Amino acid sequence: MDAIKKKMQAMKLEKDNAMDRALLCEQQARDANIRAEKAEEEARSLQKKIQQIENDLDQTMEQLMQVNAKLDEKDKALQNAESEVAALNRRIQLLEEDLERSEERLATATAKLAEASQAADESERARKILESKGLADEERMDALENQLKEARFMAEEADKKYDEVARKLAMVEADLERAEERAETGESKIVELEEELRVVGNNLKSLEVSEEKANLREEEYKQQIKTLNTRLKEAEARAEFAERSVQKLQKEVDRLEDELVHEKEKYKYICDDLDMTFTELIGN
């Protein structure tokens, strides 16, 4: 009887130990499940962060492409502005050359007119001198008449030359007026061109400032891309570590569940053994 009691006490102690181990296994399994759930939650959070970083990277790349496109447009605008400035400079040079030629033609016509006027004045003075003298001498009269004829001829020639010069002078004056109008137009155009050049210069300065700002933004975008790539790699590494941790915890959970099943089977075996022992005691 004492042996049976000792055996029952030993079996009860073993049962209690099995129960304690089973409870411990269950607690360890619950703890492992909690750690696994936390690891999975952290993995999901990391996945969301990775997705957000990838979206930020795509947005930054798109902004960088837009900045590069704007820089290309500004480069084209700058080239067009430089071409316009060169064309305006050529037009100004042509206007200045045309004005110089008109001034030279005006000076030549003025000199010819002065010569013709001087010749006409000299002929008129000679004619008046011949008329005032009233020479009685026939030969002298003939000579004077001849001189007068010559003077008249010279005067007529001078008049013709004067008319020709006057006609040419009128043409020159008309050309001069047109040249002056063109000069005034050219001056106005020069003022406009200078204003356009000033505006183009300001635009060029603005483009240079915009280009510097665009370069700074491009450097900032590159730095952001670099930072995002670094964060992406870190997040991927953490995600991989979390996945490995989840797998490790899952293996631990599986092991504890197997151990729990084994302890439950052992506990069942002890209970069955106790039942058999009680049955034997009752039967005896």
Curated annotation (Swiss-Prot):
Tropomyosin, in association with the troponin complex, plays a central role in the calcium dependent regulation of muscle contraction. This is Tropomyosin. Disulfide bonds: none annotated. Gene3D superfamilies: 1.20.5.170, 1.20.5.340. Keywords: Coiled coil, Repeat. Residues 1-284 form a coiled coil. It comes from Blattella germanica. It comes from the Eukaryota. Homodimer. It holds the Pfam family Tropomyosin. Belongs to the tropomyosin family. The keyword Metal-binding does not apply. The molecule is in a coiled coil structure that is formed by 2 polypeptide chains. The sequence exhibits a prominent seven-residues periodicity. PANTHER family: TROPOMYOSIN. The keyword Coiled coil applies.
